[in-house]
Amino acid sequence: HNDARRQRQMCIRDRVYSSKQDYFDWLERLEQFEENINNAYKINKRGLSEGYTQPKLVTKGVVAQLESIINSEIQSNPYMKVFIEADENLLTEDEKAELINSAETLIENKINPAYKKLHDFLKDDYLINSRDSIGIKDIPNGKEYYEFLARFYTTTDLTPEEIHNIGLQEIQRIRSEMEEIIRQVNWDGDFGSFLNYLRTSPRFYYDNGEDLFNAYLIMSKTIDPLLPKIFKEFPRAPYGVKPIPAESAPFTTTAYYNSPSPGRPGYFYANLYKPESRPKYEIPVLTVHEAVPGHHFQISIAQELENVPTFRKYQGITAFVEGWGLYSEELGEYINIYDDPYDKFGQLTYDMWRAIRLVVDTGTVSYTHLRAHETIHHL
């Protein structure tokens, strides 16, 4: 969910604009985006020539995203919004008009043509040559590269097979806890029928994105006063909750966090696209994972550390970053945000999701591939 295109949009949208110069500085940065997009074209073209490609599934998604940007009305283009919505207390009417006209010209004459060039290459040349498989083992030296990635992201010497087996063990553990919840709610049916109930019953879903967003706001403010029960130190940086922008929501994950910077809070972004597919029982676990005491605490406190090298304040090691997120989900037990058994099942659902990923991801690059599919089929 964190591709370069979305990062470009986020770096504009999440910046604090506190002076006239801030807007003109960002217009100057926007002028560099054409080169950035052209570099993506060159890198992907080289990768294709050397046999390094993305799966077809990924390529199709990127092509669709690029089409949505290229075909959007100029006034709704994500790069225009910051200038259209600029604070009129910081700009004169003429200055705002100058910014809008300059950005519009830049988008029409440079940025969109660069996106069109990248789009056409991906659609006409790259897609047909993209991998049918999703396993990175199918690129040159892919198996060895995957083994390196396993060491890098886990900070251990665990092999993919060992990680695979850990995932299988976790699936068994989590499944037994799920079965206990099913007994607690006196469900008259098997495991599969219970899952179907959770996925289809209107009681677990909001009718619209506004109600879903308000539920996230309420949950975050419910958690805030409970945190002194489990923490003594708090980050100085505040946090907020925002919806994931509509232009990227269909293509990205359920939620994510964007760290604070001087003058700007950290933000927990919630996906409101198709609220009928986003269950209420996921709201508590997502909030403690992405916001507090999850990534906001972990990242903000690290940034505020004193007497440590700067790189240590910003270095993100996946085993720790996501490990903290899972730890925060467990802390939800201590502040009773899973007092409803369905909310607890929601937390276990995310636990199960991670365990399944361990099995499936490692299974795509080793002889355990068939075993991974058998496991998921059983579930």
Name the predicted role of every residue range:
Residues 272-286:
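Short pre-active-site segment immediately N-terminal to the catalytic Zn-binding motif
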Residues 15-156, 160, 165:
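Conserved functional hotspot residues or short segments at active or partner-binding sites
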Residues 334-371:
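Long, amphipathic alpha-helical stalk/connector segments used for oligomerization, subunit docking
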Residues 292-305:
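Catalytic Zn2+-binding segment of zinc metalloproteases
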